[in-house]
Each structure stands twice: as C-alpha cells, then as structure tokens.
C-alpha cells in the first residue's frame, strides 16, 4: 500500500510540475514582404460538370452554402477543371457546342470575377480518348476558353491548364 501511495504521489508531483509557468514568447508581425510572388491560398473548385448525369443540378441553397464558405475562406485563387464531354462536347453526337451546360461554370466564374479571384482553368482530359493528339480538341478547347474570357467576360481566368496530368 505504501508503495502505491508513493507511486501516486510521484505521479501527482510530476503532473503538477507540468503546470509551472513558462517563459513568455513574444511574436512580432512585420510589414516586410518576404515573398512578393506568393499568390495566396486557394482551392480546387470544379463546376459540377457531371451533376445532371447524376440526376440533378446543384440547388440554389447548395450554391449559397458554397459561396458563404468561400467568402469565409477568402481564396486568392481557384483551380477550376472541366470535363469536356459534360461541358462543350456531346460524345453521343460528336458535336461541339460552347453554350452546352454553361450555367454552373458561369456561376462559378462570375463569383470569382466579382471578387477578383484568380482562376487557373483547365480540362481533365480530351472529349474522347481518340482525340488525345487531335488538333480538333485543341481548337475546341481554345475556342471554349475564348468564349469564357472574351465573349462572356470572365476576366478572372489568368492561367490555362491544358491537361490534368502528364500524359493522362
């Protein structure tokens, strides 16, 4: 019993000793810029290309929640990648239509344009795998980007990512 009391006393003493006051640490925030090239914090935000294929578009309530959270985050940049078969290319017919499924990406890019958020825009993959090295894909992709920036006025797009990963 005495041995247990001694062990408990030592443990109590050890725990109490951890509560002693520590040296005060002073933190100084300097106005000096240490990395002028730093864009800031950002996020991946894709325009829910597949939402209609899943059975429903993103609701207004979900958009409001998303925007509220992004307003809290205050991102300086967004990486926005599209999946062209759900966006501007209809795989079933083989046709290009830059106005196809434009609502969600317009909403995303409008949010970024209004808040001065830089967008790194790109495509995950070609419309169909056979187009991987086809000039037709490049032409459609560039035309769609031109449509977003010049025709619709989404000046937030500053960078273009032609492919998600090297050699897919």
Predicted regions and their residues:
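Non-catalytic accessory regions flanking glycosidase/transglycosidase catalytic cores in CAZymes
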Residues: 19-159, 168
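Positively charged n-region of N-terminal signal peptides that target proteins for export
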Residues: 1-5
């Amino acid at each position: 019993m005495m041995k247990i009391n001694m062990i408990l006393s030592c443990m109590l003493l050890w725990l109490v000793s951890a509560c002693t006051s520590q040296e005060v640490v002073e933190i100084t925030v300097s106005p000096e810029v240490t990395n002028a090239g730093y864009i800031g914090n950002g996020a991946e935000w894709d325009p829910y290309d597949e939402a209609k294929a899943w059975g429903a578009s993103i609701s207004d309530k979900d958009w409001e929640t998303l925007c509220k959270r992004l307003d809290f985050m205050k991102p300086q940049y967004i990486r926005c990648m599209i999946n062209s078969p759900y966006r501007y290319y209809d795989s079933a017919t083989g046709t290009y239509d830059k106005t196809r499924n434009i609502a969600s990406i317009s909403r995303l890019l409008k949010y970024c344009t209004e808040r001065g958020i830089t967008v790194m825009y790109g495509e995950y993959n070609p419309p169909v795998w056979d187009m991987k090295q086809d000039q037709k894909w490049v032409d459609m992709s560039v035309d769609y980007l031109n449509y977003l920036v010049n025709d619709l006025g989404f000046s937030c797009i500053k960078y273009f990512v032609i492919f998600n990963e090297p050699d897919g």
